Amino acid sequence: RVQRLKEGYTILPTMQKLAAFLNSDSDKNLPFVTDLGWLMASEVIASGLDISFAPVLDLDDSRSSVIGDRSIGDNPDQVIAIASAFIKGMNQAGMQATGKHFPGHGGIFADSHLTFSQDTRSLSELESHDLRPFDALKLQLGGIMTAHISFSNIDKEIVTFSKFWLQ
């Protein structure tokens, strides 16, 4: 869905299509995901770039028009397993991964680049669902990209400017 570099690059499946393929026998298919992470990172590095803002760690709760099929899925354990394999491939190619969109953009419909976006879920709801991939993968990530969302029951500031979320 969002692959900025196209001409001369391998067109990769969306993460959701990849996850659907993997559901048939995910443990045996994870090395394929590692290979895709390596392939993407290798091609980007070969073109002189040293970063890719991947992978998307948002959970797809079928509410977000922005995240959609860029998400691996709605199951935190599946997202963790597939993202970890993809990150491993990126790292093997020599690229750090950037997990996005912390702490999770999958629960709202609006495009936070175009309009103010607010999520009213509690911290405990986020901790048991959306935050799980970020927490599980934090030591594998070179960085995170924040969501431009206000989680108004936690902090009125959007995450990008929130001391609560950034510290």
Q: Over which residues does each language-model region extend?
A:
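Enzymes and membrane/adaptor proteins characterized by extended Gly/Ser/Thr/Asp/Glu-rich
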Residues: 1-79, 106-119, 147-156
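Second-shell residues forming the walls of enzyme active-site clefts
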Residues: 78-167
